[in-house]
Swiss-Prot record:
Record protein name field: BTB/POZ domain-containing protein 16
Gene: BTBD16
CDD domains: BACK_BTBD16, BTB_POZ_BTBD16
Pfam annotation, one family: BTBD16_C
Domain of life: Eukaryota
SUPFAM superfamilies per the UniProt record, alphabetical: POZ domain
InterPro entries per record: BTB_BTBDG, BTBD16, BTBD16_C, SKP1/BTB/POZ_sf
Species this chain originates from: Homo sapiens (Human)
């Protein structure tokens, strides 16, 4: 097996008590093995009791001792100090590497105490064997056998072997198919360095096919960084990626609910989000389908239910109501999209009636959305996905007879700006766009409360840029038609740009 040489540098020491006993400064319980027994005496700790109860020992400081003394040494082959019986195998390990795992360290110390009537003398022999003065002497400490029982089904022999290999080598490659098993092994071993590395790799490798397993692992091991990473990734990619891939059906309902409630959720429009959610429900009920269905197939499926009861009022749909209550149906204003809502037989009649009433009042009052107050939870959302090939990108949107262009510009490799501006209906690229919305507002000014957000992923972390929540009157002249501009610097691609706004009473 392998073993590293001892580091020559000595840790700084400080005298403890009236005798020649010492500890490391600023450490309540030193991990320097040469002073471990003396430390217990100086701090009035029953050393043999502490040895029999390894939880009292500060394993992290013992780990620090080995790290400081062995980190710059080449690993050599040598006789193993410990035999680990686990998963039907016997694994040969060495003390300096073993102490990186809190679980193995505690098992080792417990076995050391149980295997002799003089545990203090036994440990002192071990400490002398680790002394820099004894590097050429063979360790007098006997081989100790420890056992570890693992019941976690995620832990495979290959994954566990990879985890143990990481005790000796810091940059062992972890295959994607073994990643969950290595994470589980690191959790059981209490090998914090490897566990964190697995979490970082998982966050970097999030995609529609992996998010379910990674999110469930984060929940299982109570790893908030991983679950939060999954939530943030899905907030940006639910509509752009999830809505186009068969893996959408794997997304757990609780994760989906969190994402739908988030003000960071990116969508091209409220109707795009609705279509994504209808597809998710369709895939839950038709889980044997192997290819993404067409939009027409999904619509036909829901229209096939008897008209006497909408889908969300049926037993099969009631549990999904919390998800669809998160949707902003009031933000669906295009005539043909409203027709889809009405004839889909998916939503309760009371929901659709409220949408109709809100639209009627807004149209009667020149677009004023008097029923909307909070920009974070009620605003109408539109989005741009700015990719590598884009130098300029824009979309025209319409709301209650007002037309806006949302636009993004790339100035150089890392500089971008985003804004929106009001345009005249006569400036639309196609006259059919006017007829599509059925009406045009002739008001000279429109008060708008809005916010522009942009997010990009850089080195596994999300960069977020945003304007303040701004109230502004948009006119039709050059000086009054343009919003504030969001200017950003980022190397991340793609950039997810969200425009959220409300028409307050004016």
């Amino acid at each position: 097996m392998i073993m590293s040489n001892t580091h020559k540098a000595r840790l700084e020491r400080r005298v403890t008590g009236s005798t020649n006993r010492w500890r490391l400064p600023k450490q309540p319980f030193s991990g320097d093995l040469l002073s471990l027994s003396q430390m217990c005496k100086a701090l009035s700790i029953d050393f043999e009791e502490a040895l029999r109860n390894p939880d009292r020992l500060c394993i992290s400081q013992i780990q620090k001792f080995f790290f400081e003394n062995f980190k710059n040494k080449d690993i050599q082959s040598g006789e193993a100090d410990v035999i680990l019986e686990c998963l039907g195998f016997k694994w040969e390990l060495h003390q300096p590497q073993l102490f990186q795992s809190e679980t193995l360290a505690k098992l080792y110390l417990k076995a050391l105490a149980q295997g002799t009537t003089h545990p203090l003398r036994e440990l002192e022999e071990l400490l002398r064997a680790q002394s820099p003065k004894k590097t050429k002497e063979k360790s007098p400490a006997k081989r100790i056998i420890i056992s570890l029982k693992i019941n976690d089904p995620l832990v495979t022999k290959v994954a566990f072997a990879t985890a143990l290999k990481n005790l000796y080598m810091s940059e062992v490659e972890i295959n994607l198919e073994d990643l969950l098993g290595v994470l589980a092994s690191a959790h059981i071993l209490q090998f914090s360095g490897l566990f964190q590395r697995c979490v970082d790799v998982m966050i970097a490798r999030l995609k529609p096919s992996t998010i379910k397993k990674f999110y469930e692992a984060g929940c299982k091991y109570k790893e908030e960084q991983l679950t939060t990473g999954c939530e943030k990734w899905l907030e940006m990619n639910l509509v752009p990626l999830g809505g186009t891939q068969i893996h959408l059906h794997k997304i757990p309902q609780d994760l989906l609910h969190k994402v739908l409630k988030s003000p960071r959720l990116f969508t091209f429009s409220e109707f795009h989000l609705l279509k994504t959610m209808l597809l998710w429900v369709f895939l839950q009920l038709n889980y044997k389908i192997q290819a993404i269905p067409t939009y027409e197939t999904v619509m036909t499926f829901f229209k096939s239910f008897p008209e006497n009861c909408c889908f969300l009022d049926r037993d099969i749909g009631r549990s999904l109501r919390p998800l669809f209550l998160c949707l902003r149906l009031h933000g669906i204003t295009k005539g043909k999209d409203l027709e889809v809502l009405r004839h889909l037989n998916f939503f309760p009649e009371s929901w659709l009636d409220q949408v109709t009433v809100n639209h009627y009042h807004a149209l009667e009052n020149g677009g004023d959305m008097v029923h909307l107050k909070d920009l974070n939870t009620q605003a109408v959302r539109f989005g741009l996905l700015f990719n590598q090939e884009n130098t300029t990108y824009s979309k025209t949107i319409a709301l209650y007879g007002f037309f806006f262009k949302i636009k993004g510009l790339k100035h150089d490799t890392t500089s971008y700006s985003f804004y929106m501006q009001r345009i005249k209906h006569t400036d639309l690229e196609s006259p059919s766009a006017v007829y599509e919305h059925n009406h045009v507002s002739l008001r000279a000014a429109r008060l708008v409360k809005y916010e522009i957000r942009a997010e990009a992923l850089v080195d596994g972390k999300w960069q977020e840029f945003r304007t303040n929540q701004i109230k502004q009157k948009f006119g039709l002249t050059t000086s009054s038609c343009k919003s504030h501009t969001l200017k950003i610097q980022t190397v991340g691609i793609p950039i997810y740009v969200s425009f959220a706004f409300i028409f307050p009473a004016s």
